Amino acid sequence: AIVLMAIVIFIYRDWIFDYVVTGPINPDFISYRFLCQFSHWAHLGETLCMPPVEVNMQSNTFGGQFLGSISMALIGGIIVAFPFIFWQFWLFVKPALKENESKNTRYVIFWVSFFFFLGAAFGYFLLGPFTFNFLAGFQLGSRGTIRTLPTLSDYIDNLTNIILGCGLAFELPVLAHILTRVGIISPSFLRSTRKYAVVVILIVAAFITPSPDWMSQLIVFTPLFLLYELSILVSDRVHKKTEKESEEWS
């Protein structure tokens, strides 16, 4: 499945590169337009309108663009084929589970895939544009003597880290389900560490947003905080179900 998806991406590499891969650094990207329109609609002026930045990538080796195309195809193949990859992994792990444990993981492939793609979309449409806009526009010194000229591989690596990182980070509710099920964490533990989680999320949101205004940071903070709250709800539900099963066996 990975190879098949990679071949398809490689065949249509020019279109995918122009309209998908370089989307987050395109001034006309849908996220930029939506945030700016929302800013005007909410009577915030230009608060959420990120200034366009010019990003000129370079390839400093003869085979750089070709290798970049292969890298883009393979990474894209892995992302698109993630449900199949996890399904294969699950087929390997499932026989080691007990019958009641296996029954409680009936929809695990769907939920793992759902949260992965949700996180990947968050990284691509929100975190990616914020990050690249900030890093490309950041200037050291006041004379403008330093120009940011990222390589193709540098951009692809950063975009990959953002998408895969967010995809895996959004697996937090699934991870909370598993860790609660095996007794490593509990809903009370997650609730007691909520204040620390809020501080960490606020720091992350402040670091990756291009401007210091509260609205930009709130847009990044909100989905991450909701993800943590969802993990608490999932953990609480699993914990109650586990206690009920223990009472039935006793």
Language model segments and positions:
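Membrane topogenic/interface segments and analogous intrinsically disordered interaction regions
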Residues: 1-250
